[in-house]
């Protein structure tokens, strides 16, 4: 049985919703799944003034615990085509794990949220993949066997690089059914691969 960590940062709750969908999919494979988040860097008063979603149930992760999992599925909103600073600050503390090769051979995957349809989903995912490659992780995306990412009948997220959602500039759009199903598919897919690698 694979042990999977879903580790996310969410400002307004969109990535949080996707994280729990990812976890749901991973659990369908029989994996042991833990959902955690990275710390918020914005002062609480400022976060409240800007309507951040601060009532998130997931506990805050530590860098050291990343080595305890067979797979880590990271979730972050985009910031100008890159991961959010909160996630970057957490990732930048993993140098000790890198020195030990603690994440080599583990499965890594990423999902994201953007304000607009062309707001940097793919660059956020692929730039995050670079970090995972440096750690020697086995990088897994969202394959086209998830057919929900095809078609042009509606505005929707999901890419071959990872699941995604579109939040709109004011955060009013919530993850759609097909976006959440993409997240569940990615969770199942990653957990299944992690289980196979763990048996080898």
From Swiss-Prot:
Domain Flavodoxin-like, residue spans: 4-190
Listed Pfam families: FMN_red
Keyword Glycosyltransferase attributed: no
Sequence positions that bind substrate: 98
Annotated coiled-coil segments of the chain: none
Entry annotated with the keyword Nucleotidyltransferase: no
Keywords noted in UniProt: Flavoprotein, FMN, NAD, NADP, Nucleotide-binding, Oxidoreductase
Residues at which FMN binds: 10-15, 78-80, 113-119, 134
Cofactor(s) required for function per UniProt: FMN
Catalytic activity line of the entry: a quinone + NADH + H(+) = a quinol + NAD(+); a quinone + NADPH + H(+) = a quinol + NADP(+)
GO MF annotations in UniProt: flavin adenine dinucleotide binding; FMN binding; NAD binding; NADH:ubiquinone reductase (non-electrogenic) activity; NADP binding; NADPH dehydrogenase (quinone) activity
Cofactor notes: Binds 1 FMN per monomer.
Cross-referenced PROSITE patterns: FLAVODOXIN_LIKE (PS50902)
Intrachain disulfide bonds: none
Record: residues binding NAD(+): 12
Single GO cellular component term: membrane
InterPro entries noted in UniProt: Flavodoxin/NO_synth, Flavoprotein-like_sf, Flavoprotein_WrbA-like, FMN_Rdtase-like_dom, NQO
Family statement: Belongs to the WrbA family.
Stated name of the protein: NAD(P)H dehydrogenase (quinone)
Annotated source species: Methylobacterium radiotolerans (strain ATCC 27329 / DSM 1819 / JCM 2831 / NBRC 15690 / NCIMB 10815 / 0-1)
């Amino acid at each position: 049985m694979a042990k999977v960590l879903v580790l996310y940062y969410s400002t307004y709750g969109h990535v949080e919703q996707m994280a729990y969908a990812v976890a749901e999919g991973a659990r369908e494979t029989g994996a042991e799944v833990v959902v955690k988040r990275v710390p918020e860097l914005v002062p609480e008063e400022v976060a409240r003034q800007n309507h951040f979603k601060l009532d998130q149930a997931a506990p805050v992760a530590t860098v050291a615990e990343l080595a305890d999992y067979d797979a880590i599925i990271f979730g972050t909103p985009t910031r100008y085509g890159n991961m959010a600073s909160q996630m970057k600050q957490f990732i930048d503390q993993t140098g000790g794990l890198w020195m030990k090769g603690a994440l080599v051979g583990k499965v890594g995957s990423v999902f994201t949220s953007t304000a607009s349809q062309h707001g940097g989903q793919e660059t956020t995912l692929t730039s995050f993949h670079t970090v995972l490659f440096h750690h020697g992780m086995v990088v897994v995306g969202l394959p086209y066997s998830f057919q929900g990412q095809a078609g042009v009948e509606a505005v929707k997220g999901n890419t071959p690089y990872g699941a995604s959602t579109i939040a709109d500039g004011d955060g009013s759009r919530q993850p759609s059914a097909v976006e959440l199903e993409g997240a569940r598919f990615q969770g199942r897919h990653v957990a299944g691969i992690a289980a196979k690698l763990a048996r080898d």
